[in-house]
């Protein structure tokens, strides 16, 4: 015998489901702008700026070297890749990995991240669990096993309730991790409201990634430039332009007056 279908009151949609969605979305937007206000500017040294510009110059030479004469290309390549005194060969940078326990700025960034990400999630989640506790909000459109009951029915302990039903507390967490497409559409791709992306970065350690090794970047660029040959793209360009038939008939119109009077 089939179990009777559970019908929800329409007021639950108006006073529980939609408010949780709006509150979660607004908290994410506020968290995004608060993270922008608390974001500290990263200070770059003159050496870091100079190294980045050198890498850009080398990459531009590899991509657009075909538009300059071969002698000019070889001169620039010799400056970067000379075996004896080339820039990429003689330049060695000392890379000191920063320690979060000795760098006050890193500790400050960690504290700001906890304030803008973890604290609002705990406070709003606790408030929603206290305000909307005990409500069944919606049902997923496919059957689930009993293993999903602790995840989708937080705050509701009914053994006879189908695992496809979602409680109010679980509905909040589903919105926290399910509104990333809306945040990307409204706030942009790299926004501070995407809680799932922030948690993934914290779990993988990307939020405290060490700076790139400049020596490895120089070596990779040296190898790429060493494999680049000069392919003159403007060969016979003068003859090609002069050999084209120039149609000048359209420059003169027969209807134009030939005299002033």
From Swiss-Prot:
Cytoplasmic side: 39-114, 188-261
Keyword Transmembrane helix: yes
Transmembrane annotation, as ranges: 15-38, 115-130, 169-187
UniProt-recorded name of the protein: ER membrane protein complex subunit 3
Pfam families per the UniProt record, alphabetical: EMC3_TMCO1 (PF01956)
One of the GO biological process terms: retina development in camera-type eye
GO cellular component, one term: EMC complex
Homology family: Belongs to the EMC3 family.
Stated role: Part of the endoplasmic reticulum membrane protein complex (EMC) that enables the energy-independent insertion into endoplasmic reticulum membranes of newly synthesized membrane proteins. Preferentially accommodates proteins with transmembrane domains that are weakly hydrophobic or contain destabilizing features such as charged and aromatic residues. Involved in the cotranslational insertion of multi-pass membrane proteins in which stop-transfer membrane-anchor sequences become ER membrane spanning helices.
Location(s) in or outside the cell: Endoplasmic reticulum membrane
Protein topology in the membrane: Multi-pass membrane protein
Top-rank taxon, per record: Eukaryota
